[in-house]
Amino acid sequence: YVLTTIDFFVLCFMCILTHLSESLSEKQKRGFFLAYLMIAGISVLEVITVVVDGLPSGYRWLNIVSNYLGFGLSPAVSVCLVYVLDRKSALRRKIRIAVCCELAYLMFLLISIPYGMAFSVSVDNIYSRGPHFYIYVIMYFGAILYLSISTIVTAREFQNRSRMLIYPLILFVMVETVIQVALPELHVTWLCVTLLSVLYFIYCNEMWNQLDALTGLLNQNSYLNQTQKIKYNSGVLVVFDVDDFKQVNDCHGHVKGDLCLAGIAECIKKAYADSGYCYHLICCLIF
């Protein structure tokens, strides 16, 4: 109960912080809200399974439903966190595939309940792991791996210097999951997942705050902070200035101009991202 109370306090605080954020898009807020609500809901379901296990058989249905939803929704938390990585409103194909996999997994769990494949609840209302409990473990680790790879790819795309911090987070959540599987009486998984979601929120915000919203390149503030640390005895600074760009805005409008600038930035990133960092300043593009 104490761990669940801590979970709720932290998750409520994060929901308020997400709601008040002026830097997150509506899509990103929605993704974080869904993740926090799922973590809170699964934490409650875990408490319910502990409380009702072994009670009179009239509570058996509640034990089954709580275990089903807890096992079924666990991988969806990672999918929600992947959803917030992309600022675009449309769902990418990979996320749609992940959602379909989650729905298929939920259907499989539902169909397998009478056979006790992943878990079973006896007529005496006693929970036990099924012979194919490993399916849940595979889905859970698969979801974590999906989140990890998506975050690493996004951080590399955005040239985030802190992307190495992703690996300790991955190691942390995997170690606690192994401990939970080996020692099921501990019930520490969702407290650790709550902590992970907070750290992930901080990491993502730091990554996005370094970006220029229009071009996806590192922004001017990031450039100024970085140049203060550089020793000017090595390296090359390449500056790109788009000729007559004002005419594009004047003749075709600022919307078309922004699209042009974003396209140019994408070309520069493809050409130079492997060799150095790309920035967008107010007046020019810099590699």
Description of each model-found segment:
Residues 1-7, 111-146, 180-186:
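Extracellular-loop-to-transmembrane junctions of the mid-late helices
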Residues 214-215, 242-244, 252:
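Hydrophobic/aromatic micro-motifs used in signal-transmission helices and low-complexity FG repeats
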Residues 3-59, 63-81, 99-116, 166-181:
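Hydrophobic alpha-helical transmembrane segments of multi-pass membrane proteins
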Residues 150-152, 156-214, 221-235:
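Signal-transducing coiled-coil linker helices
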Residues 19-32, 86-96, 152-163:
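Membrane-interface helix-boundary motifs at transmembrane edges
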